[in-house]
């Protein structure tokens, strides 16, 4: 990280002293990566946005969009999560949701980019993380007796994140919620859906 901090300083100086021209343009692209590697994800995100705004027709603008999506998740990972080893799904997932949206935009804009495979891989991870977080909330509601709220959360995951690894967990929560609400016939329908999977 130390070398990248030095790189950030050098690249920022190039940008400051030579704000126009090819060197500044390349320095701004390199600055995104240097911030990212030094762990300054907020600055990497901001540098990505700045590059996109200043150079929308640059041949490497796909890289800026890609890095924007990659940094959003890390920006809110937080020190407390690292110290207390919180489950990823129990942390604030605002950044993960923003990262998902940014990477989805990247996929739509640049389907032929060299970064497409890495973006897809990260999207799968984020999709499962978001689904898991939603279902952690649903399980919290189950424990508190808020069965309708739990049912809504599980239903949200099944409707909006259908390809997640959390599908079975969502169905289990729906089944428990229906039983607790006295709707055994709906619980049986959920069981028949489970049998199809």
Where are these regions (language model features)?
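Acidic, polar-rich low-complexity tracts and alpha-helical solenoid repeat scaffolds
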Residues: 1-197
């Amino acid at each position: 990280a130390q070398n990248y901090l030095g790189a950030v300083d050098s690249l920022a100086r190039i940008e400051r002293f030579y704000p126009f021209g090819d060197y500044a343009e390349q320095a701004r692209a390199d600055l995104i990566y240097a911030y990212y590697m030094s762990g300054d994800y907020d600055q990497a995100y901001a540098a990505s946005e700045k590059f996109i705004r200043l150079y929308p027709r640059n041949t490497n603008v796909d890289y800026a969009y890609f890095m924007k999506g990659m940094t959003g998740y890390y920006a809110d990972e937080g020190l407390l999560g690292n110290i207390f080893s919180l489950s990823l799904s129990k942390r604030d997932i605002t950044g993960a949701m923003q990262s998902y949206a940014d990477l989805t935009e990247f996929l739509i804009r640049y389907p032929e980019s060299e970064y497409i495979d890495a973006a897809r891989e990260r999207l799968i991870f984020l999709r499962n993380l978001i689904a898991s977080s939603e279902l952690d909330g649903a399980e919290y509601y189950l424990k508190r007796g808020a069965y309708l709220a739990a049912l809504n959360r599980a239903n949200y995951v099944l409707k909006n994140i259908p390809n997640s690894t959390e599908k079975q967990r969502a169905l289990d929560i729906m089944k428990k919620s229906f039983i607790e609400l006295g709707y055994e016939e709906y619980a049986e329908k959920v069981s028949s859906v489970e049998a199809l999977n």
